Swiss-Prot record:
Pfam families: PPI_Ypi1. InterPro entries: PPI_Ypi1. Atypical E3 ubiquitin-protein ligase which ubiquitinates TLR2 at 'Lys-754' leading to its degradation by the proteasome. Inhibitor of protein phosphatase 1. The gene is ppp1r11. GO terms for biological process: defense response to Gram-positive bacterium; negative regulation of cytokine production; protein ubiquitination; ubiquitin-dependent protein catabolic process. It catalyses: S-ubiquitinyl-[E2 ubiquitin-conjugating enzyme]-L-cysteine + [acceptor protein]-L-lysine = [E2 ubiquitin-conjugating enzyme]-L-cysteine + N(6)-ubiquitinyl-[acceptor protein]-L-lysine. GO terms for molecular function: protein serine/threonine phosphatase inhibitor activity; ubiquitin protein ligase activity. Keywords: Protein phosphatase inhibitor, Transferase, Ubl conjugation pathway. Residues 107-119 have a biased composition (Basic and acidic residues). This is E3 ubiquitin-protein ligase PPP1R11. Residues 1-42, 96-119 are annotated as: Disordered. Pathway: Protein modification; protein ubiquitination. Its EC number is 2.3.2.27. Disulfide bonds: none annotated.
Length: 119
């Protein structure tokens, strides 16, 4: 719709007013939220057969081997521990095998002089 007014008698300015009508419809936007189950935190759970790590209340699941404390030169390893405690299980993830009496490899040969594991 448009309106205009004509010239005034005194020779004044002409003014016009323009009005526009539009059919504006509100936009209908939809928002979809997808809820996802939160991932659980990674946990380590110990079973009753997990070996205590050096009697300190800590537990280890990396290997079935038991750490052997370095001994002074000449001390026999059989004096304080059984030879049956070495890695003979088939589930050892590091591939350790029990040393046979015919081989020169001992269960502690996987360790260097500082007592850490060598692989």
């Amino acid at each position: 719709m448009a309106e205009s007014s004509g010239p005034t008698a005194g020779g004044g300015a002409t003014s016009s007013t323009v009005t526009t009508e539009s059919d504006t419809q509100p936009e209908h936007r939809s928002l979809t939220l997808k809820l996802r189950k939160r991932k659980p935190d990674k946990k380590v759970e110990w079973t009753c057969d997990t070996v205590d790590n050096e009697n300190l209340g800590r537990r280890s699941s990396k290997c079935c081997c038991i750490y052997e404390k370095p001994r002074p030169f000449g001390e026999s390893s059989s004096e304080s521990e059984d030879e049956d405690d070495c890695c003979e299980s088939a589930h050892c993830i590091r591939g350790h095998k029990k040393a046979t009496s015919g081989s020169k490899e001992t269960p502690s040969s996987h360790h260097d002089k500082t007592g850490s594991m060598q692989h």
